[in-house]
UniProtKB/Swiss-Prot annotation:
Organism: Mus musculus
Chain spans, region CABIT 2: 255-523
Encoding gene per record: Themis3
Highest taxon above the source species: Eukaryota
InterPro entries to which the protein is assigned, alphabetical: CABIT_dom, THEMIS
Descriptive protein name: Protein THEMIS3
Amino acid sequence: MEQTWDSYISSLNQNSLPRQVEVTQGRYSGSLENLSFSKGDIITVVDLEPVFVRAELKDGDQVLDVVTIPLRYEGNFQLMADPVSFETVADLTRSVRLPQSPVAPRSPPRFQNSIPISADNLPMKLRKGETLSLIGFQESRGRRLLQCKVLRKKPPLTVLLPMDCRGHFLECQDDRFYSIDTIVRWKMLAGRKRTVRVQARHHPKLLGPLVPEHFRGHLVLYPCFSVTANLLGETRVSIPSDLDISVTEIARLDRKPRTTMRQIYSMEESKFPVRVKIMNVVQSESKEYPKPLKRGQLLTILKTEEVKKFVASEISQGKKGKCFLVPYTYQGLVLRRGRYFYAVSDVAAAMKHGELCFQASQDYTSYLGSFASFRANECFLALKKSVVSAEIHGELHRVEVLKCLNIATKAHVKLPLFAVGKFLELFDGARPGTLQELCQVTRLPCHVRVTSPDPSMTVDPLYGTKELRIENVIIEQCLIAKDEPTLEDIISSADMYREWPETTFEIPIEKISCEVLVVEERSWIADVRKERCRPLQSIQEVTKESLAFSNCLVIRRPPPPVPKPRSLF
């Protein structure tokens, strides 16, 4: 079916890439963009990168304004549930972007089935109205299945739904708020319009000069993408999504279709090891992936593996610097340090699991008699969060406070959540240990200092940092690979096997968009003990953006505002 380029790109999400299309109506854009397409040209779409978002501001059915929202826009938005159901699981996965990792992010998409569901591989029939949390994909006996959690079951039941399963799935209302960057990358519905509301405390005038002061309507988002694509002759280009051409999708180009690392990961375990040739590759120019792949390179994919990693941020004077992915098996010794809290609201958020001691590093003066002031170096024991009534500017307001014990004076005080003190957590001394050992006795996030480097690494980038914040533990889906051996290696196969632990490396399938050609399924080495294939220890420096939109990085919320006189509103 012929479509405009813009319409076709809007129908895609990362789950379905790469895709190949044929140009049915060409376009010449001159020497500035250097993009010229003729009828019959073949384009392989390998990646979509959002650039900005156009949005219609609507009050009911009336369009008030059309604005452009940059990806770094600071305001947050709430999703409005899509009112139209998806008939089958295949329809659902074509529209909803899902993580390829089996570990669910903090806010996985949730849907309800409008009709009962029964399938051969389900342990029980799912009744109408079950809430399903969509986790990711799983391959079984050559079939791609959708992995879900049935939330009303205790404990939650994990089920695998085939693509042809009918459920008339309706999106559930999500009460969370997200940045525009997170929405465009993870929360859009391919082929459908995404409608959002502005966060109540956000000033709507920041969206545009024509937005009413008390705007309570909604926005319809139209993201614009930069499309990474391959042209004939392995030329790689970036194509804007609003290019004026028409295309039609094609199934495959030759008898030996190319596949992706993601599809290789989904193969049955019995088909490994497999030999592949890299046909083209897209990978970040940052330090996120330490071993670059090259076009024409031959690899032996030994197995798939779910690799646990710590997400760590370097801390300097209370501010975050570099971010790292640290192997779960990291053997450097660390010493726990107190966490940094900007405001009292951060202390309250951190004490969910018990009482907490903290020290102020700057003075705070309260102009309200019911709330306490404090000076730098004063120490407190946080007891519990509460709400009190206080007279502010002659008016009675309900204010959230943290009830604390002043450790020096033994006085019980109330600190408002909006008070800023740049606090440091206090706790009893602890012995050095590994990150794994630390996670067994404390909850993440926590702050540490590396006291001894990992002995297996030539250079440990964490050793020498003043302070690290261990944010989270993630699981990356990886292919364990080695460079294809030479003829001499194959002849002396025993030597090759002996070298595997030193030469294998990880290929994280979420970080590399790569087309490969399967050269040979190497069943003749299937009897080799795969447990010997261990990738080398490596610490990867990653960008904050790559962690933020994938829900791996814990982002501090600003403290609540100081109550203002109602006469100002």
